[in-house]
């Protein structure tokens, strides 16, 4: 086995997620190829994601038979955020398709099968700078949420137990977006809760 192939094989045994956990043994997934959302106005969507957030528009499609459009934006690391525009798309419903409030401001429940929000990863050293940049662009941004393992799962202050910092805002169609910055590696102790069934019962992890 040559050096390149050997290195690739070694890397395939470890996840590149924080902490070097074992990788997926079934499928060697490389992350998100793209997430596809639906917008009301593609021109407005391009203006927001490309001109305001700086995401390059990398692919555009006109769908056949007047069905609409499908555009792709580069969000880094080879991943894309994509949007459909359908001429006769149904109107969004708060609390069903989109969260009614920003996190920390009210109810963020959305329907089963919905995409509650999209979080973009940023370096922790740029987190505060980027929050101010969004504000300077006229975007309403939530207070910073320092996620930890406390009873409320959020702290007003950054401390060693915080694992990710978050800020939330919306795109022109009300889609909930987040800039998130990991602040520490995740380990076995971070997986300590049994998943809930449909009735709310917690079951043991296998």
Q: What do these predicted regions represent?
A:
Residues 2, 42-43, 99-172, 195-206:
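Vicinal oxygen chelate
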Residues 63-64, 147-149, 183:
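Conserved beta-strand edge residues that scaffold enzyme active sites
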Residues 175:
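Conserved Rossmann-like nucleotide-cofactor binding loop
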Residues 2-43, 118, 122, 182-185, ...:
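N-terminal beta-strand motif that seeds the catalytic metal site of vicinal oxygen chelate
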Residues 92-97, 188-192:
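A short, polar/proline- and glycine-enriched secondary-structure boundary/capping micro-motif
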Residues 31, 69, 77-79, 114-116, ...:
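Residues that flank catalytic or metal-binding motifs in active/ligand-binding sites
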Residues 38-91:
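Core segments of cupin and vicinal oxygen chelate
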């Amino acid at each position: 086995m040559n050096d390149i192939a050997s290195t690739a094989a070694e890397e395939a045994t470890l996840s590149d997620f924080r902490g070097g956990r074992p990788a997926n043994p079934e499928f060697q997934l490389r992350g998100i190829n793209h997430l596809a959302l639906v917008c009301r106005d593609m021109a407005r969507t391009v203006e927001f994601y490309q001109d305001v957030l700086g995401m390059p528009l990398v692919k555009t499609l006109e769908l056949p038979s007047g069905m609409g459009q499908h555009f792709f934006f580069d969000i880094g690391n080879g991943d894309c955020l994509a949007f459909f525009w359908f001429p006769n798309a149904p109107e969004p419903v708060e609390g069903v398709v989109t969260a009614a409030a920003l996190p920390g401001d009210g109810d963020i429940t959305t329907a089963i099968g919905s995409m509650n929000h999209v979080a973009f990863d940023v370096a922790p050293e740029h987190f505060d700078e980027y929050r101010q940049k969004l504000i300077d662009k006229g975007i309403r941004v939530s207070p910073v949420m320092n996620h930890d393992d406390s009873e409320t799962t959020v702290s007003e202050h950054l401390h060693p137990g915080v694992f990710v910092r978050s800020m939330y805002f919306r795109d022109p169609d009300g889609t909930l977006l987040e800039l998130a910055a990991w602040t520490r590696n995740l380990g076995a102790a971070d997986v300590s809760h049994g998943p809930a069934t449909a009735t709310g019962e917690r079951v043991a992890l296998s």
